[in-house]
From Swiss-Prot:
It is found in: Cytoplasm. S-adenosyl-L-methionine binds at residues 35-37, 55, 82, 103, 110. Keywords: Cytoplasm, Methyltransferase, rRNA processing, S-adenosyl-L-methionine, Transferase. This is Ribosomal RNA small subunit methyltransferase H. GO terms for molecular function: rRNA (cytosine-N4-)-methyltransferase activity. The gene is rsmH.
Length: 295
């Protein structure tokens, strides 16, 4: 698979500029994915710059391995979530870094070619694990949570206003048969909401899928942890760039950057994609980049 053909890294130029890349620097890409940002950093810090790339999705690692092979020992790959930055850097023998980037969005590989239930456009098992070594799946949540727990999850993690009728419909439907695939879940959600309340700009199941993915992968907890811990490893004057894709994440980044005494906020408002990038890559429309500097 040619990773470069199926994925376009968002806000690439803006991120590279904010990182203030230096030849020979050591940088962390906390979400390697298909290697777009990783390779850009390596290209711009040649010949001696290094990247420690964190990635917990084995499929993404396999898809990007050939593309990144030419960088040889300049690239250190860590199969961990970015929340484990301390363990990963210690294993790599690195104590301090010159910059850190995380891009929290799903890759095209996961949305378009995956088989783990991230997309409601495909009929896959309700899995949603980024790291298939994990035990909890979306199907497990759907099958075991109470109606109240499901409603709270959809409201808190998906900001879904129809959380309660959706939760009630799921509990009723699972009494008849297990809900184990994406299409099953989509049908239940669509029927639970009167058509006049179906959102016009997004799919009716978008927020439910978002909530389940966040819960399965403890995404918000991981995001909070990396912001809390990053100051220990970033050198003074180095930059921390975070690209998020929905308001839940962005609010956490905004608040924690401002509250953390290790950081000075560089972007008071999130940086968004320009018209040219929007025309080239429609998935960039939701991208929000915030940057802080280690003091």
């Amino acid at each position: 698979m040619d990773a470069e053909k199926i994925h376009i890294s968002v806000l690439l130029e803006e991120t590279m500029e904010f990182l203030c890349l230096q030849p020979g620097g050591i940088y962390v890409d906390g979400t390697m994915g298909l290697g777009g940002h990783t390779s850009a950093i390596l290209e711009r810090t040649a010949p001696d710059g290094r990247v420690v790339a964190f990635e917990w999705d084995e499929n993404a690692i396999k898809a990007s391995r050939e593309r990144l092979a030419p960088y040889g020992e300049r690239l250190t790959l860590v199969r961990r979530n970015f929340a484990e930055i301390g363990v990963g850097l210690t294993e790599a023998g690195i104590s301090h870094i010159d910059g850190l980037l995380i891009d929290i969005g799903l890759s095209s590989l996961q949305l378009d070619t995956g088989t783990r239930g991230f997309s409601f456009q495909r009929d896959d098992d309700l899995d949603m694990r980024m790291d298939e070594r994990g035990e909890m799946t979306a199907a497990t949540i759907i099958a075991t949570c109470t109606e109240e727990q499901l409603a709270d999850l959809f409201y808190c993690y998906g900001e879904e206003r129809q959380a309660r009728p959706i939760a009630a419909a799921i509990v009723a439907a699972r009494k008849l048969e297990p809900i184990q695939t994406t299409k099953q879940l989509v049908r239940v959600v669509a029927r639970a909401i009167p058509k006049r309340f179906h959102p016009k700009k997004i799919h009716v199941a978008t927020k439910v899928f978002q909530a389940l993915r966040i819960a399965v992968n403890t995404e918000l907890e991981n995001l909070s942890k990396i912001i809390d811990d990053a100051g220990e490893f970033l050198k003074p004057g180095s930059r921390f760039c975070i690209i998020s894709f929905h308001s839940l994440e962005d609010r956490i980044v905004k608040r924690k950057f401002r509250e953390n005494p290790n950081f000075k906020v560089i972007t008071n408002k999130p940086v968004k994609a320009g018209e040219e990038e929007l025309d080239r890559n429609y998935r960039s429309r939701s991208a929000l980049l915030r940057v802080a500097e280690k003091v």
